[in-house]
Amino acid sequence: MPPLDWLRRLWLLYHAGKGSFPLRMGLSPRDWQALRRRLGEVETPLDGETLTRRRLMAELNATREEERQQLGAWLAGWMQQDAGPMAQIIAEVSLAFNHLWQDLGLASRAELRLLMSDCFPQLVVMNEHNMRWKKFFYRQRCLLQQGEVICRSPSCDECWERSACFE
């Protein structure tokens, strides 16, 4: 699927209250409006509960701004040119608490792999062992760092779905 179609899919999931997106998918007001125009979409108001959840995620993500910026910049280096602002969106949602496909509101991990194949094809090739995407992102970033080798990455040991991944 072309990256623009993936952006539209995420736009629709965001407005349907799916996933763990922050407000405006973490984009600045200017970038949000640019995405809306690019997609040809009309801004539809979020229901009260969804708006509250989106605001809460934005507040939580704000406490990890430096991490989000670093992850977004790293992802942007691997992103297809016509996929912007997908790197920012993925970086924002990567700070949420579930598997990335769930936090994006996608139907399955397989659907996330399709998104990644279309928007970040080189990362899919690099992830030859099909590691969970959040863990893969942080592991790759850690390998590029010099000095301290301690990496902040999602903790599989604390995940309630651990048995589904490691049986």
Swiss-Prot record:
Q: Which InterPro entries match?
A: NifQ (IPR006975)
Q: Which residues form a coiled coil?
A: none
What molecular function does GO assign, one term? molybdenum ion binding
Q: Which GO terms describe its biological process?
A: nitrogen fixation
Keywords of this entry:
Molybdenum, Nitrogen fixation
Q: Which family does it belong to?
A: Belongs to the NifQ family.
Its biological purpose is as follows:
Probably involved in molybdenum processing.
* UniProt protein name: Protein NifQ
